[in-house]
Amino acid sequence: MNQRIQLASIDDQRNAAAREAVRRRISWPVNLTPANVTYHSRGHVLLLGRAASVSSAARALQGRGLASLTLLTTDVAVDLPATSEPVTAHLLSTHQQPQLRIAGHLGGFRTTLAQADGDALNLAQALIERDVFDVVLDLTEGALDVAAWELPPPGYLRLAWERQEAERADVLESVTELVGEFDKPRYFQVNTDLCAHSSSGNVGCTRCLDVCPADAIASIQGRIESRIEIDPFLCQGVGSCTSACPTGAIEFRLPETRRQQ
């Protein structure tokens, strides 16, 4: 009768210790994270500003391969006939304008109006039956505080229509070019073991949160501790977070050189 050979307990302990040591040396999120992020834009454009500026910009964009044009005006309503693409217009009342918020990036701009009941109205769903807009052309000249960005995300373009006449053609051309798929390097990697943001449920270092101009870094509350997360679609590689990080937990990663075929 065959007997099962019992392994010495010391072998089990050594093997377990070795496996644990290897596991700790591997940073799974870093190793499995792709080097690039991809934006997908179908060309649904939101234009925001005074009626005269928005109408002029929309007419210049008509017939240039965009999927739709949505006009949000802040003074009077407009009625712009559709040509090759659908055109939708909506007048933001003086009450609605402070409630407008825009968040996201190229191919994924969520535009909402705060409601009295606490729910937010998704304007893309209400106006064009989509979840998001792909591109935003902001012609408000800062009159509306729709987002907290110091550095706007890809796909969000600003233009003072009356004062920047010389730049109109270039900005409008940029809008038409933001249709399709676009790759951008993932500029960072985070070692959570080194991060001093939270320990034992207490929030510690917040330097990276304070310095990011793209508002790409957030503190995410876990079951016990908080952790730092960087949105790769908002990060634009400024690198202020890596300079501010006292522990080296955030490392700037240069784009990989393409191999010659």
Q: What is each model feature region?
A:
Residues 1-218, 261:
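Ferredoxin-type iron-sulfur electron-transfer modules and their immediate structural context
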Residues 62, 149, 203-228, 236, ...:
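Iron-sulfur cluster-binding cysteine motifs and their immediate structural context
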